[in-house]
Regions:
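Polybasic/polar functional segments that serve as interface/processing modules
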Residues: 1-147
C-alpha cells in the first residue's frame, strides 16, 4: 500500500486580467485555501511576478501535507490551481471559494481529481482516460474561445 494522495486541479478562464496580476490576491488565495483544507503552511508563500513575454503571477506554498500552487496568466485571463496532499480535504469547499473569490462562472471553472493506485504500478486506464478526456475538452474549449 502506498501513501494516500489527494490531488485536485482547478483551472478557470474568462477572468479579468487586472484581477489576476495582483500579488496580494495570489498570497491570500494560497493562505485561504490552506485554511479551507485544514492544513498549515510551513514554507512560503512564495509569490513571483511573471515575465513581460508571459505575464502573470505564480505562487507556491508548502503545507504540512504537501503543497498548493497557483499560476495566473493575466493576458488570456486564466488561472491554474493545484492542490496535492496526503491528507483528505473537501475539494467542493475550495471550488466554491474560488468561484466566489475569482468571480468566475461555474461554466468557466474546470476541476478534476487525479486518481492514484492503491498499489504502485497499478494505474487504472479508465481513470487516466477520464483525466485525458477532460484535458482534451478543456483544450477544445480554449481553442473555441480563441477562434
Amino acid at each position: 500500500m502506498i501513501t494516500q494522495r489527494f490531488h485536485y486541479i482547478f483551472d478557470a478562464w474568462g477572468l479579468n486580467p487586472k484581477t489576476l496580476n495582483n500579488r496580494k490576491l495570489v498570497d491570500s488565495l494560497l493562505k485561504d485555501m490552506a485554511k479551507l483544507c485544514k492544513m498549515r503552511i510551513i514554507g512560503g508563500p512564495l509569490i513571483v511576478q511573471g515575465m513581460d513575454y508571459n505575464p502573470g503571477i505564480s505562487g507556491f506554498c508548502i503545507i504540512d501535507f504537501s503543497h498548493i500552487s497557483i499560476h495566473t496568466f493575466s493576458g488570456p485571463g486564466e488561472v491554474c490551481v493545484d492542490i496535492f496532499s496526503c491528507k483528505p480535504f473537501n475539494p467542493e469547499e475550495v471550488r466554491t471559494y474560488l468561484l466566489k473569490k475569482l468571480k468566475v462562472s461555474k461554466k468557466n471553472l474546470f476541476f478534476f481529481q487525479v486518481n492514484y493506485p492503491a498499489k504502485p504500478g497499478k494505474f487504472s486506464s479508465a481513470k487516466i482516460s477520464f483525466a485525458t478526456a477532460q484535458a482534451r475538452k478543456l483544450q477544445m474549449a480554449n481553442s473555441t474561445r480563441e477562434a
